[in-house]
Amino acid sequence: MICDCCGKKKRLLDMFYSMGDGQSKINLCSECQYVARRMELDLQGGEKELYDLHRYQLRKRAKAPTEAFCLWQRELDSKIQ
């Protein structure tokens, strides 16, 4: 399994998480999942400044994002604006 954000490959005892629903289901390593989860919580709470901060952090981590990850991020961006 490979992280859809940073491209990290799963090794023995590594945790990977599945996020999203429908067409935009993505697999994330634990570090990327933590930041992505914070983005979703910021979205629910209406915290635009924190959302932008976590989005920037996730963008820095995204060395080789997949198309599914980009689609998932665009869906979140459309909800905040």
What kind of region is each of these model predictions?
Residues 13-16, 39-41:
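Short Cys/His-rich "knuckle" micro-motifs
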Residues 3-6, 29-32:
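Short cysteine-rich clusters marking metal-coordination/redox-active sites
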Residues 14-26:
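Short linker/helix segments within small regulatory modules
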